Amino acid sequence: MPDFKELKNKIKHGDFQFVYDELKKSDFEYTLENIEKEFSSVDNRDMFCYLLYVVSNENTPKYTILLCDYLMHSGTFFYNRETVIRYLLDNCLVKSGNDITLIEWILSMYEYNPDSPYNEKEIANFNRIYDSLK
């Protein structure tokens, strides 16, 4: 089990590679619940930067969704977060193709959300893609 006190301090000081390596060695399960449990005292900006670092190393739907969930549910610290979320999702969609988990997440968060970064036409297109994948 990693020393989370040390890892929190390393995140605070921007030593993301150390934290990434330690968590990888310990098979840490990156979930929003685990992040909030183990790193609750870490500043939101620092945690966002660390999770962005994780995505830069492993740009997968799992980590992209985790980062987007973090932005949605863990105390937003900037305006227009949806612009950043859309960038992350679009980038991962390009890399991963039409990954069903990404499309499900987009639809679950934004299909009926007036703050959606996606317009109605784009949401309709995601619905068509989703229907073709299931």
Q: Where do the protein language model's features map onto the residues?
A:
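Amphipathic alpha-helical repeat scaffolds of TPR domains
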Residues: 20-36, 57-74, 97-112
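Intrinsically disordered, low-complexity segments enriched in charged and polar residues
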Residues: 1, 107, 111-114, 134
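Alpha-helical repeat scaffolds
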Residues: 6, 17-23, 45-56, 81-94, ...
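Terminal domain-start segments
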Residues: 1-47
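Short coil/turn connectors between adjacent alpha-helices in alpha-solenoid helical repeat scaffolds
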Residues: 33-41, 72-84, 111-123
